[in-house]
Design a protein with these regions (language model features):
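Noncatalytic scaffold domains of N-terminal-nucleophile
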Residues: 2-47, 51, 57-232, 237-295, ...
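Internal maturation/activation junctions in enzymes
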Residues: 15-18, 206, 243, 247, ...
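Active-site rim segments in enzyme catalytic domains, especially the processed small/beta chain
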Residues: 72-98, 253-270, 411-472
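Short, well-ordered loop/turn and helix-capping segments at boundaries between secondary-structure elements
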Residues: 141-148, 160, 164, 218, ...
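Short, small/polar residue-rich loop motifs at catalytic or cofactor-binding pockets
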Residues: 281-282, 402-405, 465-467
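Short, surface-exposed charged micro-motifs
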Residues: 287, 407-408, 470
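Flexible, polar/acidic helix-loop-strand segments at domain edges
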Residues: 305
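Protein kinase glycine-rich loop
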Residues: 309
Length: 472
């Protein structure tokens, strides 16, 4: 059998270096370049990011432009009302940063409020689980601190997409189809944009989104500097008409959700204004070394360290000897994943509110201790977090509203790297805010109402998220 080759073992023409045997059959070429590259969840998004690179922008500029485009192109997967954790590697400075792009809970969102209203589990739909939208502030923070382009350069193409339209495609059509009856019966503001359902290839538009974000952009046009213009647009979104319109919508109407009752949102203008001013955090990424490669993830407010824990556990096994994707290989992989996710459930949460023992969780000693729990002959069906007694695996009482997530990666000619995972604020879980063209997110569903849990609900706290971009 022909030996598989790593990408580094091929020359610029795709020929294996030092190898005379046939190259393994492939139907697509290896994509290579010297100017930069963008990969994204939709081809038009990737093209927009690539155009920014060609115009002289860096990886951050390109990634943000692609990210804004994804909010228009993939509303079934993410939206400007959602969140986006970001990882950036700065080649010249030889350092990486993480942007905590997760919105926080409103001041009124307390465990007492939910329990006193008979809510025992935060629903996955409607207005009740809405956090303050984080996406726009996260993109702007990345652009301000690490980008070079203007907000018009990176937001303009998305506005053009929303205004002029783009072809309907199967995944979006299916996403709308799943909730079309709800659009008709409960969420007419969503139906006004996405119904009647377009056929594949038919051009669809979101003029409300285009008007909203053009007004956001115009708020900074009179400013004398790039930085001042971005900040003026941030204020317009979080302190001005966008926030006011979203709050008027969420406070004046109650929408049915998975609890069986109808609820309004819990936001206030202060929640939005404070988040817009100081809510987005730039942090050090969490990292671990796996077989000589440094892998970087966002902190324990995300799912990032779970992968690092898995890698620490896997490092103790001879995976090559097990054979790629054999039953033995997959068994070891899955058992390591179970142990890492059990620790996530027990320990992870917003580090501003919970003490997360990351140093211990990512230590070699802890990995060796946990690795001994793995039986290579039998699967374990218990939740086994470290240092506490095993628990039976349970399930949530409410059905989870399924959405999706998308992603964008960018690299530029200077060696800068950008990875972001925008999610939430999708059209399947919450009604579109009238006049704005996008729904609010529902990430509050991730909170626990157990006050002793590290991910317990609290005002101004970020829910633990599953989103997890990576750099290596």
């Amino acid at each position: 059998m022909t030996r598989p080759f790593a990408a580094s073992e091929y020359d610029a023409h795709g020929t294996a270096i030092g190898e005379t045997r046939p190259v393994p059959f492939a139907t697509r070429p290896v994509l290579q370049g010297t100017h930069g590259m963008v990969a994204a969840g939709h081809y038009l998004s990737a093209a927009i990011g690539q155009r920014v690179l060609e115009q002289g922008g860096n990886a951050v500029d390109a990634g943000i432009a692609a990210g804004f485009a994804l909010t228009v192109l993939k509303p079934q997967s993410n939206g400007i009302g959602g969140e986006v954790p970001i990882l950036i590697h700065l080649a010249r400075e030889r350092r990486s940063v993480a942007i905590n792009g997760q919105g926080w809970a409103p001041a009124a969102a307390t465990i007492d409020w939910f329990t006193s209203h008979g809510v025992r589990l935060i629903p996955s739909d409607g207005l009740l689980p809405a956090m303050v939208p984080a996406q726009f502030a996260s993109w702007c923070t990345a652009l301000l601190q690490f980008g070079t382009a203007s907000l018009a350069d990176v937001l303009g193409p998305a506005i053009e997409l929303a205004e002029s339209g783009f072809p309907m495609y199967t995944a979006l059509r299916n996403g709308i189809l799943k909730v079309a009856e709800r659009f008709k019966a409960e969420w007419p503001t969503s139906g006004a944009i996405y119904l009647p359902l377009a056929a594949d290839g038919e051009v669809i538009r979101n003029p409300d989104w285009a008007r909203t974000m053009k007004a956001v952009l115009d708020a900074g046009l009179r400013e004398s500097s790039r930085e001042a213009a971005i900040r003026a647009s941030l204020d317009y979104f979080y302190r001005g008409p966008v926030a006011e319109q979203a709050l008027a919508f969420s406070s004046s109407r109650a929408f049915p959700d998975a609890t069986g009752d109808a609820h309004r949102g819990l936001h206030s203008l202060e929640d939005w204004a404070e988040y817009g001013a100081s809510g987005t955090r730039v942090e050090e990424p969490v990292s671990a070394t796996y077989r000589g490669v440094t892998v970087q993830k966002c902190g324990p407010w995300s799912q990032g360290p779970v992968l690092l824990q898995q890698l620490k556990l896997l490092e103790g096994f001879d995976l090559a000897a097990l054979g790629h994707n054999t039953a033995e290989y997959l068994h070891v992989y899955l058992e390591c994943a179970k142990l890492a996710f059990a620790d996530r459930e027990r320990y992870y949460g917003d580090p501003a509110f919970a003490s997360v023992p990351l140093e211990r969780l990512l230590s070699d000693e802890y990995a060796a201790e946990r690795r001994r729990l793995i039986d290579q002959e039998q699967a374990c069906n218990e939740l086994r977090p470290g240092s506490i007694a095993p628990e039976a695996v349970g399930t949530a009482a409410w059905p989870v509203v399924t959405g999706d997530t998308t992603h964008v990666d960018a690299v530029d000619r200077w060696g800068n790297l950008f990875a972001a995972t925008p999610s939430g604020g999708w059209i399947g879980s919450s009604p579109v805010v009238e006049g704005l063209g996008f729904p609010l997110g529902t990430r509050g569903q991730m909170f626990s109402l157990d006050p002793e849990h590290p991910n317990a609900l609290a005002p101004r706290k970020r829910p633990r998220t599953t989103l997890s971009p990576s750099l290596a």
